[in-house]
C-alpha cells in the first residue's frame, strides 16, 4: 500500500492552530500525534487508519499533521524507532562496558523489557505488519537486527562464562520480546515482569549464581527501583 503524501498546500508554513484544546498526553503536537497514531494502529490496524483520522483524534487539522510527518509511513517509522533505538544505544555501550557478561545482559534485558512493558500502547505488535517488509522500512529492520545481534553477542559471552548451551544464544532476545505477546493477550504486566524475564534469560544461558548483586547493579545503572522481591 502506498504512503499518504503531503498535499502541496500543506507543505508550506508551520501549520494551522488547533481545532480545540489538546486531547492527548504529550507536551508537543508531535508527541500527541504519535500517541493518537499508536492507539489507532494497534487497536484498529495500520492500513485502515488515515492521517485525517489521526488528526481528528489529536484535535488538529490534517494540514498541521503534515507539518510534523510527511506521510503515514513516517509516523509508523517514528513509533517503531522508539521501541529499539534506546535499547540499541544501551546495548552498544554494554558490549564494550566493564563487568561480567551476565551483568551486562541483565541490564539490557531489564531496560528493554521495561520499555516494552511501560509503553502506553503495545507498539511491538506492529512488528508483524506486512508493510514492514517493504523497502521503506528496511532501515528499521536493520536496526532491529542489530539489536538482536547485540543480544546474541552478550549471550554468547554469558554462555562462555557459565558453560551454558550454545544453541540458547538467541533466546534472551526472544524472551524479552515475549512482552509483546503478553500484552496482545491483554494480560496485565507487573513491575517485576522485566526482572523475571531478565532472570529467565540468564538462567537459560547457564547462569546459576546469586541474582541479588545483579539486581542491585542493574537498578543503579538504570536509575530505577528494584522489585520488592528480587530474583534469587
Locate the predicted segments by residue.
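C-terminal peripheral helix-coil segments that are non-catalytic and often amphipathic
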Residues: 1-14, 148-161, 181-232
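Arg/Lys-rich, glycine/proline-spaced intrinsically disordered segments
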Residues: 15-20
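Generic hydrophobic, amphipathic alpha-helix propensity
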Residues: 29-37, 54, 79-87, 91, ...
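Helix-turn-helix
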Residues: 32, 40-74, 78
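Amphipathic alpha-helical interface segments
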Residues: 36, 40, 111, 175-182, ...
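Hydrophobic alpha-helical connector segments
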Residues: 78, 92-118
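Amphipathic alpha-helical packing segments from all-alpha helical-bundle domains
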Residues: 88, 134-174, 192-199
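Amphipathic alpha-helical segments used for helix-helix packing
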Residues: 104-107, 115-138, 152, 170-173, ...
Amino acid at each position: 500500500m502506498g504512503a499518504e503524501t503531503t498535499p502541496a498546500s500543506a507543505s508550506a508554513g508551520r501549520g494551522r492552530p488547533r481545532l480545540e484544546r489538546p486531547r492527548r498526553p504529550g507536551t508537543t503536537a508531535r508527541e500527541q500525534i504519535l500517541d493518537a497514531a499508536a492507539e489507532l494502529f494497534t487497536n484498529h490496524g495500520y492500513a485502515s487508519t488515515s492521517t485525517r483520522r489521526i488528526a481528528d483524534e489529536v484535535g488538529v487539522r490534517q494540514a498541521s499533521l503534515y507539518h510534523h510527518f510527511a506521510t503515514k509511513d513516517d509516523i509508523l517509522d517514528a513509533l517503531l524507532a522508539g521501541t529499539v533505538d534506546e535499547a540499541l544505544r544501551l546495548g552498544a555501550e554494554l558490549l564494550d562496558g566493564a563487568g561480567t557478561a551476565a551483568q551486562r545482559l541483565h541490564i539490557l534485558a531489564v531496560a528493554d523489557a521495561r520499555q516494552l512493558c511501560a509503553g502506553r500502547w503495545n507498539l511491538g505488535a506492529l512488528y508483524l505488519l506486512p508493510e514492514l517488509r517493504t523497502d521503506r522500512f528496511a532501515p528499521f529492520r536493520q536496526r532491529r537486527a542489530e539489536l538482536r545481534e547485540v543480544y546474541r553477542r552478550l549471550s554468547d559471552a554469558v554462555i562462555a562464562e557459565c558453560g551454558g548451551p550454545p544453541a540458547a544464544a538467541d533466546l534472551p532476545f526472544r524472551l524479552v520480546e515475549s512482552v509483546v505477546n503478553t500484552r496482545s493477550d491483554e494480560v496485565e504486566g507487573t513491575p517485576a515482569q522485566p526482572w523475571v524475564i531478565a532472570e529467565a534469560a540468564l538462567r537459560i544461558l547457564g547462569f546459576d549464581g546469586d541474582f541479588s548483586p545483579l539486581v542491585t547493579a542493574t537498578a543503579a545503572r538504570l536509575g530505577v527501583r528494584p522489585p520488592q522481591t528480587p530474583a534469587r
